[in-house]
């Protein structure tokens, strides 16, 4: 999805760490990928410390083909806004974002794409869902993002696909157990 097999990648884990299991799950998963030795994939863990995350982008970002920031939606938005105030031009980097824990609107995704240096709109953001005891259970795909965006744009599609929804749901792909 993020082409880590083709591009050197810096993954910045901005999920809360410590007693918050989600940040530790993300770190462990990213570390396992890095430890395979199959990819040019590095992981750093500033957690929810926005200033440290921005320092990492400035200091380490130029050394990689792409940067993936993993974080909660509101924190990522803060990073994008603060980065601009701290002299980061997000478009200078190939940025991608890996969200969790909260839903968001397509307007929010558009904001991240436009302001956050995302070059490929259907491959530059992904949201995933899970629980502390089971880990990731489902995630977005480019197809699910297209379906959601079409449904948001066209009311008749929304009512056909999401008949009982009262807000923008996420169509997701299930992650089968054992994979």
Predicted regions and their residues:
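Conserved AMP-binding
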Residues: 15-18
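A short, structure-level motif marking secondary-structure boundaries and short turns
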Residues: 11-13, 94
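Conserved short alpha-helical elements in the N-terminal third of ANL/AMP-binding
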Residues: 24-37
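Active-site glycine/GP-rich loop and adjacent strand/helix microenvironment
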Residues: 35-179
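Conserved adenylate-forming
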Residues: 1-10
